[in-house]
Amino acid sequence: MKTFQLMMISFLFVAITTTSGVVSEGNDVVYDGEGDPVKPNVPYYISFMTSDYNMWICRMQYGSTDPNSCPQQPLMVTHPNLAAPTPVMFVLANKSDVVRESAKLKIKFVGPRQCGKSGFWKVVQRNSSEGEVFLNGSKSMSHNDSTFAIHKTNEYYKFTFGDGDYPTTISMTNDYPIYRLLSKRLSGEMEIYFYKNLTTSEG
């Protein structure tokens, strides 16, 4: 009888644990600035923290104000020209209809190829502990140099790079007013938010 009771208790514990796990997975959806779930293959603008800071991800050449100059890379730009912020789309490895935290994904600028490069973000390693985000990444999930994930911070979100046990955090340089994006261990994180359009974010 005791054995049967212990087995039932163990079964209930496993069932409760499993159910809790399913619930927690359902709560890790990434949300945009309007409170809607972020969806794959839908354009979003990326801001530093909230849109109040007026800092946006743009596809530009570092050090140039000409939007058509090459080479280009993802940059966080302070008070950019209204036409400069470039929306991105998140491409998932799975068939989910929403983007979830920690899910493997690719980040791709919306629009045609420019400067002869794909719009997919890619980390180029400078050394064993630091890399920089450029373009011409691959849409294939087998290419680790182009694999990112989104994680919740206290109030916003952040990007991490790599699908190993120790992903790096995407942070920004100190190059005001245009910041390059770095992939570094034990560094500050670039806290971000997502907006479907600039009109809503500015309103």
UniProtKB/Swiss-Prot annotation:
InterPro entries: Kunitz_inhibitor_STI-like_sf, Prot_inh_Kunz-lg. SUPFAM superfamilies: STI-like. Keywords: Disulfide bond, Glycoprotein, Protease inhibitor, Serine protease inhibitor, Signal. Disulfide bonds join 70-115. Residues 1-21 form the signal peptide. PANTHER family: KUNITZ TRYPSIN INHIBITOR 2, KUNITZ TRYPSIN INHIBITOR 6-RELATED. Exhibits Kunitz trypsin protease inhibitor activity. This is Kunitz trypsin inhibitor 6. It comes from Arabidopsis thaliana (Mouse-ear cress). The gene is KTI6.
